[in-house]
Swiss-Prot record:
The lineage of its organism: Bacteria, Bacillati, Bacillota, Bacilli, Bacillales. Involved in the biosynthesis of isopentenyl diphosphate (IPP) and dimethylallyl diphosphate (DMAPP), two major building blocks of isoprenoid compounds. Catalyzes the conversion of 4-diphosphocytidyl-2-C-methyl-D-erythritol 2-phosphate (CDP-ME2P) to 2-C-methyl-D-erythritol 2,4-cyclodiphosphate (ME-CPP) with a corresponding release of cytidine 5-monophosphate (CMP). NCBIfam families: ispF. This is 2-C-methyl-D-erythritol 2,4-cyclodiphosphate synthase. Keywords: Isoprene biosynthesis, Lyase, Metal-binding. SUPFAM superfamilies: IpsF-like. 4-CDP-2-C-methyl-D-erythritol 2-phosphate binds at residues 9-11, 35-36, 57-59, 62-66, 133-136, 140, 143.
Length: 159
C-alpha cells in the first residue's frame, strides 16, 4: 500500500533571526518568524508526512500555544513525526519539495538541504528533491516579506 501526503507552510521574514531552511543555516540579513525555529521547509515535510498517515498536522502535534515548543528545533519535530510514520508501518518512497523565496538565492544550499532531509527521513539522498523558485517579484514572496514551501511525500508500507 502507498500513501501520499502534501504540506504547505509560510513564514514571515524578519530581522534578528537566523534563516534556517531544510535544517541548513543560510546567511541572510533576515530570518523566519515563528514559535519554533520557523524552518518552513522542514515544517512542510512534517505536515506532508503526518498527513500521509492521517495523523493531522504540525499544529496538532506541536502547537504554537505550548511553551514546550518555543524555539524548538524543526529537525527534532520532523524526527518525532517520522517516528510516527515508522510506527504506522511505512517507509519513504520519495519526497519532493519546492521553496519559494525571492532572496536569498538557494542553489548553493540545495545539496546540503537534501542531505540533511535524507538523514532525518532515514533514506538515500536520491529519494529527496528540493527545488527553489522565485515568484518573479510578485506577492509577499516577491516583496521579500516571507518564504513559502510545499512538499509532497510518498510512503510505502514497510515489508
Amino acid at each position: 500500500m502507498i500513501r501520499i501526503g502534501q504540506g504547505f507552510d509560510v513564514h514571515q521574514l524578519t530581522e534578528g533571526r537566523p534563516l534556517l531552511l531544510g535544517g541548513v543555516h543560510i546567511p541572510h540579513p533576515k530570518g523566519l518568524l515563528g514559535h519554533s525555529d520557523a524552518d518552513v521547509l522542514l515544517h512542510t515535510i512534517t505536515d506532508a508526512a503526518l498527513g500521509a498517515i492521517g495523523a493531522g498536522d504540525l499544529g496538532k502535534h506541536f502547537p504554537d500555544t505550548d511553551e514546550a515548543f518555543k524555539d524548538a528545533d524543526s529537525k527534532h519535530l520532523l524526527s518525532q513525526a517520522w517516528q510516527l510514520v515508522k510506527n504506522a508501518g511505512y517507509t519513504l518512497g520519495n519526497v519532493d519539495c519546492t521553496v519559494m523565496a525571492q532572496k536569498p538565492k538557494l542553489a548553493p544550499y540545495i545539496e546540503a538541504m537534501r542531505k540533511q532531509i535524507a538523514e532525518l527521513l532515514e533514506t538515500d539522498v536520491a529519494n529527496v528533491s528540493v527545488k527553489a523558485t522565485t515568484t518573479e517579484t510578485l506577492g509577499f514572496v516577491g516583496r521579500e516579506e516571507g518564504i513559502a514551501a510545499q512538499a509532497v511525500i510518498l510512503l510505502q508500507k514497510a515489508e
